[in-house]
Amino acid sequence: MLRQFYAKILLVIFSSILLSFAEKGDETKVRIDLTNIIGEINPNIYGHFIEHLDKCIYGGIWKGNDFNYKVVDLIKGLNPPIMRWPGGNFASGYHWMDGIGPIENRPKKYDLAWHATDPNTFGTDEFIKLCRMVNCEPYICVNMGSGTAEEAANWVEYCNLPAGASYYADLRVKNGHEQPYGVKYWGLGNELYGDWQIGHTDAHTYALNAREFSKRMKWVDPSIKTIAVGCDDPQWNWEVLMIAGPHIDYISLHEYYDHPDYYERVASPLAAERSLKRLAATILAATGENRIKIAFDEWNLWRPQGLASAIFSAGIFNVLHRLCQNVHIACLAQLVNVLPLIIADEKGERPTPSYFVFQLYRQHAGPLALKVDVDGESYTSRAWGGEIQVPFIDVSATLDKSSNKLTIFILNRDKEKSRECEIKIRDWQGKAEGQVWELNGKDVESDEVEVKERGKIIITPTFKYTAPAHSLTVIEGKLNL
């Protein structure tokens, strides 16, 4: 019965994706409904992830026994809302007390996840300092692979209890940090459904353990939010939600995509949309409500290359705008040197193409997602299970009621030609001056991309804009509402 139930859910979701974008002529009609607000966009969907993997931290963020401040400055340029650490697979073997206290006294440990020596010179206090420097929320993933609920609860004590409240709170003070860190977000392990993980287990066992971990951690600090391990298997998610559901606040999903063909790569955000919708349907079916939100806390291409990776990232953000009622956290994996937004190597420190996508959405997106209908030409993707009709033009729109600012994000996946869009704003009569920004490069493989201001545009109830090939366009204007 359970499998039949999920088969029906998948059929409905899959059918809705197939039918949303029928093949049409070259002109794309975009309809934005100012009165149909999907929901509030949680800024944590523009989040990041760093792990003790390759040169993400050591040789990237951390240089010798201090920060690489050029990397820190680039991170600041993203205005990051949230950052996940220490893993990833690394988290399943990490014992947090190895990474506190005087750096010279910390033990070197051999990391079984990535088969490398970790000097432990970057630990909890350094992570919190990084978050403070770049003004973002810390999100810590505890060790449920080889760790215990007691160890996790002690970590919450170290981070969140006031001086004098416990041994671990006083240990933080001893290490030079009088005030509690106030870490709000705590992950309950990482990918424990996979046999590549230390502590790999079945859904039932994980759910029982997650319930106990979350209870112990919340008894230390009831204000924290915990994120359980989810995946693209409805049966795993069902078990976790049924057993641990009352004790958790989020369930996670990790999605990576890889394909040599450009059009399949940039179609993959719609496969992610399908998976996220399926998880949202599972949450509703298992709990009868939407209290538990989704943390899409690892996503990326396995081989992010050039402008194509930026087109992919913009597609993900348009999906997250559409699913803002369900997805409240999302973290690209990873921030520095590993499938990165920032590269730090012998050539210096520099951003990759997707870096500018994050900047554009973070800087310009308003707090409310609007319903957008897109009617235009599409192509068929067959790489991600079944067939998905992929629109060449993909649009999301946001509204800031405090300033009456409308922002339209227009993604053109077509790598060959520009596409004309007729944009109609429903339930509005007026005229406004807007500003246009365009992210583009010479071709989809190019790493040399830039954001250009394309000048002014007059926004009317119906207006036209031609989206250049392989581009992301942002149109922003204050409407007289």
Language model segments and positions:
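Hydrophobic h-region of N-terminal signal peptides that target proteins for export
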Residues: 11-22
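Non-catalytic accessory regions flanking glycosidase/transglycosidase catalytic cores in CAZymes
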Residues: 2, 21-237, 242-250, 272-273, ...
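Bacterial N-terminal signal peptides that target proteins for export
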Residues: 1-10
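Active-site His/acidic residue clusters
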Residues: 254-268
